[in-house]
């Protein structure tokens, strides 16, 4: 994912050198203007310039400043061309000066060397040598033998100060760019975490509502169908019994729904012994559907609340699917742990079975999807086997985060 440029989106977003040049545009332009004004004042004070030379000097300085202003555009492919042109312009400007006033132009050479520090990488040494060569030629042309030592004594400190300032400036710009990019990456990561948190919370809400309200309503619907059949046959006593069971089931569903809503508001509390909850769930299904439910519980470790809660809802969803879709007569539930600290959960029925691949792709059936999401939420592994007319078997393996119980 692209990170927005701290200065301008349209510029080279990830090019540190281009950003350095962007940061240098205004202070660099001010420095060039200072060189221009100082050169004009000194030459006119000495009385050694004509109007024609003034025009030529002004035009060259303007071109130099214009190229500097757009230096960020030269970074990627035309770095050598940029410094070659700027070096020649500086060379020409120095030749327009007279006598010792070439010291003013030293500032432009030092300025270009400072730009090389922030703009060029592998070709830095070559470009610096190129500019120093031009400076030596300028100095040799303008200075007499007796002036060379004075020139070096004055010019060297000036260049060192300007180059040091440029290096410090670019180092500060680099740190600022890194800080801004880091801040933007952190903000982006924070937004992504918020989005993922919201998405996960929505998925959890969908699972909880499905595992409470949807399962309860499915069970109630089956009981109402049974009541209708018994009333049609005149078996009012049995219909009354099922109505009583339905009322209990409605109360239980309401309680589960409230528990799910409370869970959205606060952290999950301990849900009790898993075996007792599964047994209670099986009793409800036996009463409402007439199915036979067999439990093989050989768990020796205490499950954390999250794992126990998800296992409970997975079993409930499997039983609902077996009653609603598979038309099963018997359900076998097995729970055990192994020596490697893993929980094994198997739910098997003798229903009509189904095509597993088509079942995974079928839209609108949140049961299988909900099981997969719950298994993923507890870092488990999920496997489903189904054969037509022979039933379905769901196998789940989950790492246990608990301690061994005392025998």
UniProtKB/Swiss-Prot annotation:
Q: Name one Pfam family in it.
A: HATPase_c
Residue ranges that the UniProt entry lists as topological domain Cytoplasmic: 1-25, 68-78, 121-125, 172-407
Q: What InterPro entries does the entry give? A: HATPase_C_sf, Sensor_HK_TwoCompSys, Sig_transdc_His_kin_sub3_dim/P
Q: Which SMART domains match?
A: HATPase_c
Does Ligase appear among the keywords? Answer: no
* Record domain Histidine kinase: where: 201-402
Q: Which UniProt keywords apply?
A: ATP-binding, Cell membrane, Kinase, Membrane, Nucleotide-binding, Phosphoprotein, Transferase, Transmembrane, Transmembrane helix, Two-component regulatory system
Query: Which residues are on the Extracellular side of the membrane?
Result: 147-150
Q: What pairs make up the disulfide bonds? A: none
Recorded catalytic reaction(s): these are: ATP + protein L-histidine = ADP + protein N-phospho-L-histidine
**Where Phosphohistidine occurs, residue numbers?**
210
For this UniProt entry, what is the primary localization, expressed as one broad class? membrane
Q: What is this protein called?
A: Sensor histidine kinase YdfH
């Amino acid at each position: 994912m692209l990170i927005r440029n701290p200065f301008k989106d349209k510029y080279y977003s990830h090019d540190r050198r281009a950003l350095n040049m962007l940061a240098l545009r205004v202070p660099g332009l001010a420095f060039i203007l200072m060189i221009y004004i100082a050169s004009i004042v000194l030459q006119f004070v000495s009385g050694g310039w004509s109007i024609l030379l003034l025009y030529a000097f002004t035009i060259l300085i303007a071109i130099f400043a214009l190229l500097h202003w757009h230096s960020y555009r030269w970074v990627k492919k035309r770095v050598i061309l940029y410094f070659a042109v700027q070096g020649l312009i500086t060379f020409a400007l120095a030749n327009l000066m007279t006598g010792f006033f070439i010291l003013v132009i030293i500032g432009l050479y030092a300025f270009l060397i400072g730009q090389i520090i922030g703009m060029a990488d592998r070709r830095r040494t070559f470009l610096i040598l190129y500019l120093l060569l031009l400076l030596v030629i300028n100095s040799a042309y303008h200075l007499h033998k007796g002036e060379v030592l004075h020139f070096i004594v004055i010019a060297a400190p000036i260049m060192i100060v300007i180059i040091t300032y440029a290096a410090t400036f670019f180092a500060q710009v680099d740190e600022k760019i890194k800080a801004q990019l880091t801040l933007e990456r952190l903000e982006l990561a924070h937004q992504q975490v918020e989005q993922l948190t919201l998405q996960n919370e929505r998925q959890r809400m969908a699972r909880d509502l499905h595992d409470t309200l949807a399962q309860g309503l499915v069970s109630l619907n089956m009981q109402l169908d049974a009541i209708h059949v018994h009333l049609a046959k005149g078996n009012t006593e049995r219909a009354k019994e099922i109505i009583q069971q339905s009322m209990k089931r409605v109360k239980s569903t309401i309680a589960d729904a409230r528990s799910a809503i409370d869970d959205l508001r606060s952290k999950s509390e301990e849900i009790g012994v898993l075996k007792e909850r599964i047994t209670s769930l099986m009793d409800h299904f036996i009463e409402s559907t007439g199915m036979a439910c067999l439990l093989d519980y050989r768990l020796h470790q205490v499950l954390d609340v999250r794992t126990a809660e998800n296992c409970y809802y997975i079993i409930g969803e499997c039983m609902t699917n077996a009653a609603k879709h598979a038309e099963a007569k018997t359900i076998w539930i097995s729970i055990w742990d192994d020596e490697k600290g893993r929980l094994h959960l198997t739910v098997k029925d003798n229903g009509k079975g189904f095509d597993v691949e088509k079942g995974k792709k079928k839209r609108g059936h949140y049961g299988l999807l909900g099981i997969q999401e719950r298994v993923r939420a507890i870092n488990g592994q999920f496997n489903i086997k189904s054969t037509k007319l022979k039933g379905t078997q769901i196998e789940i393996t989950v790492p246990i985060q608990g301690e061994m119980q005392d025998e």
